[in-house]
Amino acid sequence: MKKEKAVVVFSGGQDSTTCLFWAIEQFAEVEAVTFNYNQRHKLEIDCAAEIAKELGIKHTVLDMSLLNQLAPNALTRTDMEITHEEGELPSTFVDGRNLLFLSFAAVLAKQVGARHIVTGVCETDFSGYPDCRDVFVKSLNVTLNLSMDYPFVIHTPLMWIDKAETWKLSDELGAFEFVREKTLTCYNGIIGDGCGECPACQLRKAGLDTYLQEREGANN
């Protein structure tokens, strides 16, 4: 894959930034694509742009604001509380988001001569999101190949690892401090370690604490 080109679906968060570093190591050329779907914090787009600029990665932002018209949710509406009731989808779930993001990433990839698409979806910590499942990604991969008659390969480096292992991967890629300090995972728009209270921050911190304990134990 070292001679090929990839497009990374990129939000500027921990997972997609780790995937960006992974792609840089795996492919000869990498581009990043970020989607503006009127998310609560436009800082997410700015953060993604800054990271791409710092890493020297060509960065495209696509307007997907129609998602907010079709599927109101807590990631785009400040008047909706971030909740996750047992047996129900989280209020942060956006119907069709990964379906559309990966589809548009594929269109872009074909236009720029890339057949590899990288996304940070993860089934281990999928938080009740059906479009983060491996079966969905594999199904969409086949559909995209058929729809555009093009040999896309969707890569999911984080699919079967948890947050602690994601931190480990970033460390192995030499990007641990970069990911910790410069990414935006927090639903409240705080870069780095975040607010520590929202579900995204709690998941990130739990993984970080576990990995740091494991790393310390391995070094002793």
From Swiss-Prot:
Cofactor note text: Binds 1 zinc ion per subunit.
Leading EC class: ligase
InterPro entries: QueC, Rossmann-like_a/b/a_fold
Cofactor: Zn(2+)
The protein's role, per its UniProt record: Catalyzes the ATP-dependent conversion of 7-carboxy-7-deazaguanine (CDG) to 7-cyano-7-deazaguanine (preQ(0)).
Binding site for Zn(2+): C186, C195, C198, C201
EC number(s) on file: 6.3.4.20
Pfam families: QueC
Gene3D superfamilies the UniProt entry points to: HUPs
Taxonomic placement: Bacteria, Bacillati, Bacillota, Bacilli, Bacillales
Binding-site list for ATP: F10, S11, G12, G13, Q14, D15, S16, T17, T18, C19, L20
Protein name listed in UniProt: 7-cyano-7-deazaguanine synthase
Family assignment from sequence similarity: Belongs to the QueC family.
Keyword Nucleus: no
Biological or metabolic pathway of the protein: Purine metabolism; 7-cyano-7-deazaguanine biosynthesis
UniProt cross-references to CDD domains, sorted A to Z: QueC-like (cd01995)
Quaternary assembly: Homodimer.
GO term, biological process aspect, one: queuosine biosynthetic process
Record keywords: ATP-binding, Ligase, Metal-binding, Nucleotide-binding, Queuosine biosynthesis, Zinc
Catalytic activity: 7-carboxy-7-deazaguanine + NH4(+) + ATP = 7-cyano-7-deazaguanine + ADP + phosphate + H2O + H(+)
Organism encoding this protein: Bacillus cereus (strain ATCC 14579 / DSM 31 / CCUG 7414 / JCM 2152 / NBRC 15305 / NCIMB 9373 / NCTC 2599 / NRRL B-3711)
GO molecular function: ATP binding; ligase activity, forming carbon-nitrogen bonds; zinc ion binding
